[in-house]
Amino acid sequence: MQEMYTICETPLFTKYCLVYWTQEEYEEFKTFLALNPEAGDAEPNSGGIRKIRWTSGGRGKSGGVRVIYFNRLTNGEIWLLTLYSKKQTVQLSKKTLQALVEKLNDSFND
């Protein structure tokens, strides 16, 4: 049996999630990612952040959303950090990605 990981999400992700997805689309994504935690591309120099393309509102992956997430597989967790439409943001900066990882790591140490 394939290992399934716990999906956790930041308040920022929660805020935007249902803007882009129906509840059904969201559940489909979470199930896929829980079974395939390394499906997205690793973002260079980001401290372990990954990005995956996913459909939104019937548009294909290229016109859908980008989901930014962070694996803590040794703890059995995948953290959904944020998501955005390709039309809104082309790429998050290295500095933004590093700040997301720092904030997440700080929360683990609290």
List the predicted regions and their residue ranges.
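Basic/aromatic recognition patch in beta-strand/loop cores that engages polyanionic ligands
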Residues: 43-82, 88
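Enriched for short, Lys/Arg-rich terminal
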Residues: 71-110
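Arg/Lys-rich, positively charged N-terminal/basic patches that mediate binding to nucleic acids
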Residues: 1-24
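Amphipathic alpha-helical interface surfaces
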Residues: 9, 25, 29, 61-64, ...
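Juxtamembrane/interface motifs at transmembrane-helix termini
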Residues: 36, 47-50, 100
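Localized chelating/binding microdomains
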Residues: 6, 14, 51-53, 109-110
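Compact soluble domain cores
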Residues: 12, 21-41
